[in-house]
Amino acid sequence: MSDSPSLSPPAPSQGPTTPRKGPPKFKQRQTRQFKSKPPKKGVKGFGDDIPGMEGLGTDITVICPWEAFSHLELHELAQFGII
């Protein structure tokens, strides 16, 4: 059996020469700042422009908080933590 080639272990595959890096690490911001200012309370366009209500002015106390932000969408209220 001298004619049979000798079995040798397969050559190790050549991997990357640089060490593997883990996933990128992101720095978390300390404070979260909104790009726009939070909405102000009050119904938009309510007050002196209603016929018969000229003497009342625009300082109207709103009892229901939904009325105070009726000019906004729900996602805008949620963005600023109102709901």
Curated annotation (Swiss-Prot):
One of its GO terms (biological process) is positive regulation of MAPK cascade. It comes from the Eukaryota. InterPro entries: PDE6_gamma (IPR006952), PDE6_gamma_sf (IPR037030). Transmembrane segments: none annotated. Its EC number is 3.1.4.35. Belongs to the rod/cone cGMP-PDE gamma subunit family. PANTHER family: RETINAL CONE RHODOPSIN-SENSITIVE CGMP 3',5'-CYCLIC PHOSPHODIESTERASE GAMMA-SUBUNIT-RELATED, RETINAL CONE RHODOPSIN-SENSITIVE CGMP 3',5'-CYCLIC PHOSPHODIESTERASE SUBUNIT GAMMA. This is Retinal cone rhodopsin-sensitive cGMP 3',5'-cyclic phosphodiesterase subunit gamma. The lineage of its organism: Eukaryota, Metazoa, Chordata, Craniata, Vertebrata.
